[in-house]
């Protein structure tokens, strides 16, 4: 029997792992043990990619093998999340609903970092008395953190005139400080805080409740979308105090008709597209020498797995791109572009293929 080469062995193991990862996306389980399993698979996936690069292998299953330092960093992050979830699974919160979005890396790193967070509402802060100079921040419904004694505890965030905070081990911990934000976005060192339809003055404080809560899925999408928002788009974000981040570099303009608690607009602003996500995903709104396409947008790891699995549906599409992203956008979020010979073929594809809930679908047309 012929012995497998290192590349063949690693390719086989990677394929099996990525099939299991995609199963997690498709099943969309809501128990904590499933999320622990998911992050273990992500760790093993990056361990394989790390090993491949050590052997000088630059491609596995048509997938580019990233540099060693990237695979190492991703593996360490996966271990961090896996260990945190294992600890949480031993707490009294283990029977709560835990989804991939609740335990994703983006929310874990969002302030307050190294905490799990669920739900959230928006607090609007207006600088210089100017309604057009507004920034928005998340007041989390639930923050899960490790106490000084190593026990997982749960609390709700509160908002005061001075910032957004939570009580940790009896101490007030601010994860957004409005004075620091005012130094970045204002000129007169004055600001107004509006939360839940109320204006909060220097002596007031309000805590998060269950009314008008934004889900973790919506928050993640808003965090992903924030880096591409224009100044007229009010995005939900929680920038670190004293640190400027690309997602919140410029003040947003806030209008009375803006929807802060609804699903984020998933339009991909691409001159090649004539339509995008809408109530009628398959409605053609342009004409000319175009071909039907869809954009699949989501986490790069899930897209790589999805691209691999789509090979068995090759009869239902014409071409599929590698994973790509817009310059300046969130590097963890990618896009796959799939082209079709006709609208009929595209409709069949959408009927036959199961797309994970974590992947956004944008339907359109592209000039050839």
Swiss-Prot record:
Pfam families found in the cross-reference section: PPV_E2_C, PPV_E2_N
Which stretches are tagged as biased composition: Polar residues?
A: 227-236
Enumerate the UniProt keywords alphabetically: Activator, DNA replication, DNA-binding, Early protein, Host nucleus, Isopeptide bond, Phosphoprotein, Repressor, Transcription, Transcription regulation, Ubl conjugation
Q: According to the UniProt record, where is the region Disordered? A: 227-251
Gene3D superfamilies in the record: 3.30.70.330, E2 (early) protein, N terminal domain, subdomain 1, Papillomavirus E2 early protein domain
- Glycyl lysine isopeptide (Lys-Gly) (interchain with G-Cter in SUMO) crosslink site(s): 297
Query: A biological process (GO) annotation for this entry?
Result: regulation of DNA replication
**Any GO MF annotation of the entry:** DNA-binding transcription factor activity
Region Transactivation domain: what ranges? 1-207
Question: Where is it found, in Gene Ontology cellular component terms?
Answer: host cell nucleus
Record region (DNA-binding domain): 290-368
The record's account of how the chain is modified after translation? Phosphorylated.
Principal place of residence:
host cell
Job description of the protein: Plays a role in the initiation of viral DNA replication. A dimer of E2 interacts with a dimer of E1 in order to improve specificity of E1 DNA binding activity. Once the complex recognizes and binds DNA at specific sites, the E2 dimer is removed from DNA. E2 also regulates viral transcription through binding to the E2RE response element (5'-ACCNNNNNNGGT-3') present in multiple copies in the regulatory regions of the viral genome. Activates or represses transcription depending on E2RE's position with regards to proximal promoter elements including the TATA-box.
Question: Tell me, how does this one assemble?
Answer: Binds DNA as homodimer. Interacts with protein E1; this interaction greatly increases E1 DNA-binding activity. Interacts with protein L1; this interaction enhances E2-dependent replication and transcription activation. Interacts with protein L2; this interaction inhibits E2 transcriptional activity but not DNA replication function E2. Interacts with protein E7; this interaction inhibits E7 oncogenic activity. Interacts with host TAF1; this interaction modulates E2-dependent transcriptional regulation. Interacts with host BRD4; this interaction mediates E2 transcriptional activation function.
Family per similarity comment = Belongs to the papillomaviridae E2 protein family.
Put simply, this protein is called Regulatory protein E2
Which species does the entry assign this protein to? Human papillomavirus 45
Q: Tell me the name of the encoding gene.
A: E2
């Amino acid at each position: 029997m012929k012995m497998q080469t290192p590349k063949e062995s690693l390719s086989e193991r990677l394929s099996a792992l990525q099939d299991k990862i995609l199963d997690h996306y498709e099943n969309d389980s809501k128990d904590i043990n499933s999320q622990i399993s998911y992050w273990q698979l992500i760790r093993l996936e990056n361990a394989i990619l790390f090993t491949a690069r050590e052997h000088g292998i630059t491609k596995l299953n048509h997938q580019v093998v990233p540099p060693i330092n990237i695979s190492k960093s991703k593996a360490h992050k996966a271990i961090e999340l896996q260990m945190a979830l294992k600890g949480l699974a031993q707490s009294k919160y283990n029977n709560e609903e835990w989804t991939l979005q609740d335990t994703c890396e983006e929310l874990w790193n969002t302030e307050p970092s190294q905490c799990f967070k669920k739900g959230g509402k928006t607090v609007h802060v207006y600088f210089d008395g100017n309604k057009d100079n507004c920034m928005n921040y998340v007041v989390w419904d639930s923050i899960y953190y490790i106490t000084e004694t190593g026990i997982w505890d749960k609390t709700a965030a509160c908002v005061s005139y001075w910032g957004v905070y939570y009580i940790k081990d009896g101490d007030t911990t601010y994860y957004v400080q409005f004075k620091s934000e005012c130094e970045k976005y204002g000129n007169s060192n004055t600001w107004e805080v509006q939360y839940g339809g109320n204006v909060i003055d220097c002596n007031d404080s309000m805590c998060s409740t269950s009314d008008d809560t934004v889900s973790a899925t919506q928050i993640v999408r808003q965090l992903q979308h924030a880096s591409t928002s224009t100044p007229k788009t009010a995005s939900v974000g929680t920038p670190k105090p004293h640190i400027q981040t690309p997602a919140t570099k410029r003040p947003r303009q806030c209008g009375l008709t803006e929807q802060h608690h609804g699903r984020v607009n998933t339009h991909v602003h691409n001159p090649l597209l004539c339509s995008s996500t809408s109530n009628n995903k398959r409605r053609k709104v342009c004409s000319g020498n175009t071909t039907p396409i869809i954009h699949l947008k989501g986490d790069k790891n899930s897209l790589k797995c999805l691209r691999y699995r789509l090979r068995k549906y090759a009869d239902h599409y014409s071409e599929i791109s590698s994973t790509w992203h817009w310059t300046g956008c969130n590097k963890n979020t990618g896009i796959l572009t799939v082209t079709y010979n006709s609208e009929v073929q595209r409709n069949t594809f959408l009927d036959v293929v199961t797309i994970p809930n974590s992947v956004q679908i944008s339907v359109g047309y592209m000039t050839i």
